[in-house]
Amino acid sequence: MSGETLEFQAEARQLLQLMVHSIYSNKDVFLRELISNASDALDKLRLASMRDKDLDVDTSDLHIAIEVDQDARTLTVRDNGIGMTRDEVVQVIGTIAKSGTAELLRKLRETTDAETSQELIGQFGVGFYAAFMVADRVVLVTRQAGEADGTHWESSGEGTYTIAPATDVPQGTAVTLHLKPVDSEDNLHDYAAEWTIRQIVKRYSDFIAHPIRMAVERPGSDDSEPTTEVQTLNSMKALWARPRDEVEPAEYHEFYKHVSHDWADPLEVVHMRGEGTFEYEALLFLPTHAPLDLFSPQGRRGVQLYVKRVFIMDDCEALMPGYLRFVKGVVDAHDLSLNISRELLQQDRQIQVVRRRLVKKVLATVKDLKANQPEKYRTFWTEFGAVVKEGLIDDTENRDSLLEILSVASTHDPAEPTDLTGYVNRMKDGQSEIYYATGENRTTIENSPHMEAFRAKGFEVLLLTDPVDEVWVERVGEYDGKTLRSVAKGQVDLDTDEERSAAEAERERQRTEYADLLTWLGSALADQVREVRLSARLTTSPACVVGDAHDVTPTLEKMYRAMGHEVPQVKRILELNPTHPLVSGLRKAREQGATEDSLTETAELLYGMALLAEGGELADPSRFTRILAERLARTL
């Protein structure tokens, strides 16, 4: 057979090599992956036949066949499903189009620990490539439903593969593994043995909705010849339809791996049934770790939808909001049409009811983890908290539930995050606002000038470092009757009435003393700021830049511009610390007749330092560094 030899895409080649030389101990899972792929192909064919009346295919006996040849040491997994075209074979097997692949491969190369390797591989879901853990050579023959000719693909996993047209190929896909020798030390079992196959199918794929068949030879009685009979290896019982107390944890785990293509066990299982005017069953899973494409627009979304045990679609976005896009599983609705489209699902009243119930159940499950299994909750929030917080922006119906499971870093304890209830319970007498600060990371926030007065007075501040935090705090506005207040916005006055009264005379003196400087600075920096004023929030820094209560923050400005939105630049407010030597020195220099150029340069340095201190960016870094260098040179 003449064919074309092609190279695997670079990242696919690297991942393939990791599988060929895998330190992953449980190599049995290769069969689970191949069966799962075959099951998907059968579901897709049935769905295509319902939606395309011109597709002439027989769906009366959709099944998976396992064929073994002890003498040739081969194992074949065959399905009569949708099949693939040549281009699809190249795209699906020859390349990897997942975001985050390079980073995953780097981590895999650096680790020599089997458990860590397993966890990292699980984040990717290598699927078909798992075959190379147990095979020296893999042959795939496929023909797409409705096409006349098929495709023959073959590789030994060494960086290249051959691909060629194939004739007289049955519809569907057959994957033949030329097995490596049995090696108990390397956990390579006899995968051509009937008993081994039975055990693996029972353990990993018993719930698959299509029959998994294997021809089994039975010895004849007395002098009669041995006979061959085809047996079905799996029970095909829909796991979600069984009572929860009849399902073993291991069964849940394997079903999760089937629907999610994850190799790790789920963090938590949500098994529920809806009865009444609209019946449905749902089996949902919270993963242990975030997928690599969690923040990718092309990432997988939603759960699988079935109608009366018939697969309808993957990634049913109508059943789960975007902020719960990591939830995996199955929803089996009893009263929907088999031909319902994605567009109609969005408007279907019954689906909307199911969606509301699913969301409430998932959030209630997380709340229960928070109360009773804090380690599991901590894992969940570390992996998915940044996504869940997206729900605080638009899901007003569940906002209270989301706020109950919210966890944020705080100045109260560097090691342990807090929830909003804990913050409120620790508030000082007379405190009416919940203070928060946003920034790229904890260190930047804690070192920001905006934090000085709060630190000096002992006020707890929430430290928000996810980009979404900038949006949800504005949208939520308050919690338990307490306003959410940014430490970098508006006027700050943390003094008690007694302290304020005692300091009033000094503040009035400062206002009078600095009036001229503030007016001059407002004019000198008119292109950068809209106001210059004295600060009550600074204790050690000379200056800081703040916004009014309803101003868009610089971080949000950057986010909107990155998304292609036109955002007018908001001029902010420069606050000065009247007790700082630099500020008082600038006042004296102006009073003593320093040159305008010298004063203006000092003003620019003061403003630039305030921007840098909060993690901001300078409009003209080269001018700033030139002025600073000249000033430093004069001191030497």
From Swiss-Prot:
It holds the Pfam family HSP90. Residues 559-636 are annotated as: C. Residues 1-342 are annotated as: A. Keywords: ATP-binding, Chaperone, Cytoplasm, Nucleotide-binding, Stress response. Signal peptide: none annotated. Its main location: cytoplasm. GO terms for cellular component: cytoplasm. It is found in: Cytoplasm. InterPro entries: HATPase_C_sf, Heat_shock_protein_90_CS, HSP90_C, Hsp90_fam, Hsp90_N, Ribosomal_Su5_D2-typ_SF. It comes from the Bacteria. SMART domains: HATPase_c. Residues 343-558 are annotated as: B. One of its GO terms (molecular function) is unfolded protein binding. Belongs to the heat shock protein 90 family. Homodimer. NCBIfam families: PRK05218.1 (NF003555). Molecular chaperone. Has ATPase activity. This is Chaperone protein HtpG. It comes from Salinispora arenicola (strain CNS-205). The gene is htpG.
